[in-house]
């Protein structure tokens, strides 16, 4: 088994095969506290192209003290439908039953996303697997398309989940972030008005039944992740970070656990490269919580303030039944032009405007999709991310670091214009 010690040391979990062209993309990472286990997922493809995705792969990592020992790679052949390719791993852990739900989509043959959007004919199926032994074995695949989407799928040109992890809210609700290309208008047999919008798939009965929430509108949003942050006592807020084609990241808030979101806003602190890129977000509780903080331009702000990003007058405060003093970590390439220099940003006051730090660069050079996981009992953070020397498709690396490294880093740099 391969051992990965902290801090800030990367280990390659999935490596592109130069001879065959086999490529691993779309990382998803889940940490299971009871067994101190990491589950690292990715797509196995016969080339870098989306339409050449084949199946999902998994590696299990065991925390030993403050390092990780990784087991061998396993093909998840359970996560397949006949005549379909499997894409977009999105795992979530249900703490009451101990089950891991692995969501993904199965897309018919080699039908491209563009083809589905142009013709307005969906070729994707919403599926999941369940594991009751921390990812050692998996049950049979279940197709949830009819149950969750039903007849609405006729208006969805295509859709996907995640990619990256889902979460369980303080209330017990399970959340799987998703997005769909909604067809609002047709001309003859063509879908002439199709826009992507993020939404949530959720379960309130420990994963027995699943439903979907409303689209995040009117901003065009796509791949997304969510995190729960502290609002008024008893009223936690769900924060959503979504990819856009608008050069900046979109942020939206929900006060009803993801059923619907208020109008999203573009954050000028969080740049998207020209083609956009997926990003990851997690909430965490820092060891030391000061009463005031300094933002990236040196202005102090009290720890409790009115929230201008929400329609309702929520305040940030500690509550007995809600997450206490929750901050956010966000991973994303920092360049305004291309996918390079993966940065880790933190936000000490998620409900306030423009409170993101400058990025701590986790990986210099080509960097793509990423997924974060918090190891709360060790005060560590893990990141699974695409990277390489010439392009970001060469490998998927795992890195373990402490929140202290991010919070105390003096070598923070502004987003690159390269």
Swiss-Prot record:
A motif (FRIP motif) lies at residues 24-27. It comes from the Eukaryota. BNR repeats lie at residues 129-140, 203-214, 254-265. The modification Phosphoserine is found at residue 312. Keywords: Carbohydrate metabolism, Cell membrane, Endosome, Glycosidase, Hydrolase, Lipid degradation, Lipid metabolism, Lipoprotein, Lysosome, Membrane, Phosphoprotein, Repeat. One of its GO terms (cellular component) is external side of plasma membrane. The active site is at 50 (proton acceptor), 369 (nucleophile), 386. This is Sialidase-3. The lineage of its organism: Eukaryota, Metazoa, Chordata, Craniata, Vertebrata.
